[in-house]
Amino acid sequence: MAAAGAGAGAPDRAALTVGPGMDMPIMHDSDRYELVRDIGSGNFGVARLMRDRRTMELVAVKYIERGEKIDDNVQREIINHRSLKHPNIIRFKEVILTPTHLAIVMEYASGGELFERICKNVRFSEDEARYFFQQLISGVSYCHSMQVCHRDLKLENTLLDGSPAPRLKICDFGYSKSSVLHSQPKSTVGTPAYIAPEVLLKKEYDGKTADVWSCGVTLYVMVVGAYPFEDPEEPKNFRKTIQRILNVQYSIPENVDISPECRHLISRIFVGDPSLRITIPEIRSHGWFLKNLPADLMDDDSMSSQYEEPDQPMQTMDQIMQILTEATIPPACSRINHILTDGLDLDDDMDDLDSDSDIDVDSSGEIVYAM
């Protein structure tokens, strides 16, 4: 989950205290946001549910330790996410620099991950899957119109608001790439189950076309309740998953009832040659996608008009870049600890334990390198 908080032009505003039993920042009571509870953690740090004292609005705040963790992925996430304003995308609010962390403040989606919903249901009915897929494509289409490809679309990066008919919200733009700001993607990023074959070939690829493949994996999981390219005998063998992706080796189980139209759409998405794969505009005109399509998803202009501008002025790009530059400087306590532990050589023996594989997959299934 992604979250963050910052006051425009006031990087020194957030004093920190340390919570019981943890070495993570809590914004001081005098600050704008107050802690409600922790809501997640990952390689980045922790995400917390916070309350805006002025508006009483709940927000999600992602804390990333200052220093080397403020890398290109973090900067890309913030720069790209800041430009996106759409009902199916988690809203970026601001960044705050604390003495020890960079905090990214964003909209809170109280309905949790779409992944959690599918786990509870095993799989969705075709109508329910279509309802969420329509929203996913609406959000992805908007991203692409803004020249941003996500590159890590998956159920875990799609959140739901708390409404009775949940609205899907795309989050986590840490791997996203803008064709305006960046070159064509070359790096292998994302989660193996969702990665398009051309991404695995270590050549330049069209990030928008790769996003289409990932959307197809999401659709398949919703209607089937399993990943399309996992080996049924060894579902956690990620190397086999990668090989099956490269061979476009998948099937729909006989016991799963899916309409011919849905099967056709899936078959048009899972095409190994990206130049022959269905595009987002073509998906939006596909018969299966158009069935029961909500009126507000038919027109991009009407979707944009639903986006309410925040009361507070948005931080300028210059302000954000200044905060990011300062965030790359480690906190003083970390520098002292580094000096103290550096002389002990505690980590020397660990340097020889690097994996010798070309494609490095950790136990969670994340691709953990970039060419």
UniProtKB/Swiss-Prot annotation:
What does UniProt list as catalytic?
D152
What happens to this protein after translation, modification-wise? May be phosphorylated.
Q: Tell me, what is one Gene Ontology molecular-function annotation carried by this entry?
A: ATP binding
Q: What class of enzyme is it?
A: transferase
The GO annotation for biological process reads: abscisic acid-activated signaling pathway
- So which domain of life are we looking at? Eukaryota
- Start and end of every Protein kinase domain? 33-289
**What InterPro entries does the database record attribute to this sequence?**
Kinase-like_dom_sf, Prot_kinase_dom, Protein_kinase_ATP_BS, Ser/Thr_kinase_AS
Instruction: Show the segment(s) annotated as C-terminal.
Output: 282-371
Question: Which residues are listed for ATP binding in this entry?
Answer: I39, G40, S41, G42, N43, F44, G45, V46, A47, K62
Please state what the annotation says regarding this protein's domains: The C-terminal region is necessary for the kinase activation in response to ABA treatment.
Q: How does it assemble?
A: Interacts with PP2C53.
The similarity annotation says: Belongs to the protein kinase superfamily. Ser/Thr protein kinase family.
**What's the name of the protein?**
Serine/threonine-protein kinase SAPK8
- Organism, as annotated: Oryza sativa subsp. japonica
Name the gene that codes for it: SAPK8
